[in-house]
Amino acid sequence: MAQDSNNLIWIDMEMTGLNPGTDRIIEVALVVTDAQLNTLAEAPVLVVHQPDDILNGMDKWNQSTHGKSGLIDKVKTSILSEAEVESRMLAFLELHVPAGTSPMCGNSICQDRRFLARSMPKLESYFHYRNLDVSTLKELAKRWKPEITQGFNKQGKHEALADIYDSIEELKYYRQHLFNI
């Protein structure tokens, strides 16, 4: 598939916590859609190795969530560094979307951008500076059309790839019910 500047790059990451100054990225997933939100390509989900001291520093919520999903075990056995994950994800994106054209798409995406800016700056700079943040629409729907907010339920698995598909489906829902498109 050739590069298309109208394609959208969706990203989700799992981290050891919410502070990009002290916490680390442990899982990255990318999906490319066309402008109508049809999936065009899915990158392999990559797990970043992090040392035990980083994993042991996670709070109870993260230890429980990432333990139940099996992600902690995957992190321990992964041989991929942050730099290797960044390089592989860039190689994937270069096949589908020209640099600097797609906003960063997802839910609460500025949190992902903060982590990328610190730990994977080349990947962060591949995106346009704008964000397509589905959580913005959720907040607007709560205020402008609260009756539709109960109509979409995310799976909430806290697994990067599943969370991307949740975000895409949520945006499709708002496109239909908030914008009537």
Swiss-Prot record:
It comes from the Bacteria. 3'-to-5' exoribonuclease specific for small oligoribonucleotides. Residues 8-171 form the Exonuclease domain. The gene is orn. This is Oligoribonuclease. The active site is at Y129. One of its GO terms (cellular component) is cytoplasm. InterPro entries: Exonuclease_RNaseT/DNA_pol3, Oligoribonuclease, RNaseH-like_sf, RNaseH_sf. It comes from Nitrosomonas europaea (strain ATCC 19718 / CIP 103999 / KCTC 2705 / NBRC 14298). Belongs to the oligoribonuclease family. GO terms for molecular function: 3'-5'-RNA exonuclease activity; nucleic acid binding. Its main location: cytoplasm. Keywords: Cytoplasm, Exonuclease, Hydrolase, Nuclease. It is found in: Cytoplasm. The keyword Lipid biosynthesis does not apply. Its EC number is 3.1.15.-. GO terms for biological process: DNA metabolic process. HAMAP family: Oligoribonuclease. Pfam families: RNase_T. NCBIfam families: PRK05359.1 (NF003765).
